[in-house]
Amino acid sequence: MKTEEIIKSIEAEYLKSDLPIIHVGDTIRVGVRIVEGDKERIQPYEGIVIAKRHGGINETITVRKVFQGVGVERVFLLHSPRVASIKIIRRGKVRRAKLYYLRDRVGKATRVQERFDRPL
């Protein structure tokens, strides 16, 4: 076996199978596991997916939201054990693979048109 095949077979054990199909422009809610002392809780983080990178076990998404007038972006490793759940709230209609231009927009200009032809 080639080295690539060996790596893919090892990574396949750690891939999550219950992830929804996520597209750039979608509004999603990510449940993030937070450990405080000996307690563990799930903190929701809701925002628009502005970028998707890589594939396989290294797949990441960048989620942006505006909190108290300040734009906050977080990068999530999709197959990480810290990501408890991902729920799609609404589908977005965009023509770009990366929505970095939303960083420069303010107020209603940051809205993304909703798409109805893809199921949630």
Curated annotation (Swiss-Prot):
Gene Ontology biological process: translation
The superkingdom listed in its UniProt entry is: Bacteria
Please report a single Pfam family linked to this protein.
Ribosomal_L19
InterPro entries associated with the record: Ribosomal_bL19, Ribosomal_bL19_CS, Ribosomal_bL19_sf, Translation_prot_SH3-like_sf
Signal peptide feature range: none
One CC-aspect GO term: cytosolic large ribosomal subunit
Mind listing the UniProt keywords for this protein, alphabetically?
Ribonucleoprotein, Ribosomal protein
NCBIfam families (alphabetical): rplS_bact
Q: Which family does it belong to?
A: Belongs to the bacterial ribosomal protein bL19 family.
UniProt-recorded name of the protein:
Large ribosomal subunit protein bL19
Q: Lineage in the entry? A: Bacteria, Bacillati, Cyanobacteriota, Cyanophyceae, Oscillatoriophycideae
